[in-house]
UniProtKB/Swiss-Prot annotation:
<dbReference type="GO" id="GO:0005737">
    <property type="term" value="C:cytoplasm"/>
</dbReference>
<feature type="compositionally biased region" description="Gly residues">
    <location>
        <begin position="533"/>
        <end position="547"/>
    </location>
</feature>
<dbReference type="GO" id="GO:0042026">
    <property type="term" value="P:protein refolding"/>
</dbReference>
<feature type="region of interest" description="Disordered">
    <location>
        <begin position="523"/>
        <end position="547"/>
    </location>
</feature>
<dbReference type="GO" id="GO:0016853">
    <property type="term" value="F:isomerase activity"/>
</dbReference>
<keyword id="KW-0413">Isomerase</keyword>
<protein>
    <recommendedName>
        <fullName>Chaperonin GroEL</fullName>
        <ecNumber>5.6.1.7</ecNumber>
    </recommendedName>
</protein>
<feature type="binding site">
    <location>
        <position position="493"/>
    </location>
    <ligand>
        <name>ATP</name>
    </ligand>
</feature>
<comment type="function">
    <text>Together with its co-chaperonin GroES, plays an essential role in assisting protein folding. The GroEL-GroES system forms a nano-cage that allows encapsulation of the non-native substrate proteins and provides a physical environment optimized to promote and accelerate protein folding.</text>
</comment>
<dbReference type="InterPro" id="IPR027413">
    <property type="entry name" value="GROEL-like_equatorial_sf"/>
</dbReference>
<dbReference type="GO" id="GO:0005524">
    <property type="term" value="F:ATP binding"/>
</dbReference>
<dbReference type="GO" id="GO:0140662">
    <property type="term" value="F:ATP-dependent protein folding chaperone"/>
</dbReference>
<keyword id="KW-0547">Nucleotide-binding</keyword>
<dbReference type="InterPro" id="IPR002423">
    <property type="entry name" value="Cpn60/GroEL/TCP-1"/>
</dbReference>
<comment type="subunit">
    <text>Forms a cylinder of 14 subunits composed of two heptameric rings stacked back-to-back. Interacts with the co-chaperonin GroES.</text>
</comment>
<dbReference type="InterPro" id="IPR027410">
    <property type="entry name" value="TCP-1-like_intermed_sf"/>
</dbReference>
<keyword id="KW-0067">ATP-binding</keyword>
Amino acid sequence: MAKELKFSEDARRALERGVDTLANAVKVTLGPKGRNVVLEKSFGAPTITNDGVSIAREIELENHYENMGAQTVKEVATKTNDVAGDGTTTATVLAQAIFKEGLKNVAAGANPMILKRGIEKAVQKLVEEIKELSKPVEGKEAVSQVAAISAGNDEEVGKLIAEAMEKVGQDGVISVEESKSMGTSLDVVEGMQFDRGYLSPYMVTDTDAMEASLEDPYILITDKKISNIQEILPLLEKVAQSGKPLLIIAEDVEGEALATLVVNKIRGTFNCVAVKAPGFGDRRKAMLEDIAILTGGQVITEDLGLKLENADISMLGRAHKVTVTKEDTTIVEGAGDSKEIQNRIKQIRTQIENTDSDFDREKLQERLAKLAGGVAVIKVGAATETELKEKKHRIEDALSATRAAVEEGLVAGGGTTLIDAIPALDELNLEGDEATGVDIVRKALEAPVRLIADNAGYEGSVIVEKVKSEDKGIGFDAYNGEFVNMIESGIVDPAKVTRSALQNAASAAAMLLTTECLVADKEEDNDSNGNAGMPGGGMPGGMGGMM
């Protein structure tokens, strides 16, 4: 396909128009008095959101050149969201500010490659300063504040997330699901839970709740299919003599083996529950190993040269309690060695850091949570489907932001930290266009505070100058229209969010500034592609002549 090209100033101006289109759509949502954006859906109700990345993802421009600029800034929002879970609007605003300020200097003759170097050095210095300004998150109250702000000043959501994090710990899994009721609630599952239930309803111990509860049971863990009772008979006899119940986790238990276990349960001779092993393939082996480490048992597998017939009672795991329902099995207080469990957790953490696949990362995170803490489910309820989607989205954002805060600490919110970090740039002794690059960043750092004030109906430039003249940590509370100590007032941002927004914005803006040529597909002109080579009626006329 033929290509069209644009060069130098033309190219950069086209990119600027694209950046502005996307950034202006996202900008309206910034701050406590920011507005919402309504996104049309191909089917169903439209989505109403104030989440920067959701808006950015919907934007695709008709003009190829402008679209390149818009897509580059969209990536800034997406990357910030992936890393920190929030701060997407701030990142977009910073990218636009750095790019526009940089364009003026490039047009005035500055070398974009040297400017880029100056911008990078400025950002490096600012990241160090943000680290210095951050304060660790301590206590449930602080966690609750961060979550509430990220969820659009919703204190109820803040409390729920703080409670969930307190119960399952930093490594626990907190998932957000839709509730069938109007209210929003929290369910916590302690211990290790996996999604496999009993193989026969005759195994239940509580017929009302249809669940089996085993107190202080032995746990047999194997990746084999058990169909012949003779394979496990010696083991069953030893467990029966101990008077303890037994949980069997195997690839499957079927035929004669299952029938024998059920008959013994009904007669009251021996209490045993069988469940299928969780997961599939290599993931199943890893999960069985997790269960073995948690309960202090061994996986009886032929990979290790172990056979069921030769298994000893010392190879079985133990737990304080096991509850099995039709769908789930929960192991509470496994008897595994805490040192072994910690080593396993470290190993899974390393795998999480090294994996490139989002799916694998999610599954590893689940395994980590099951070993380290537990699982909490926030069930979101609302009056209408549109409100439900919006609320669920807000809670997911708040959850990511809260995790980021626990990880790297908190800084003053409302763009205040970016202005507080400006004096640190004076320590950089650079010259020429590198110094200009630093000045570009210095000016761009004012953009978030200016915009928050503008969106709340105040004069942005006046507010920026006032924040600059105040002590560090004093910022503008746009909701109440007053200058306050941001951290004491609970207006805070996770340091990771502020850092990621700045790094991603500067990276994209600097790349756009160094652009000298744009190449895009040439738009097809429908008129020129018509029947130019074959005038209308030419062929029938010719045919008539031949006849």
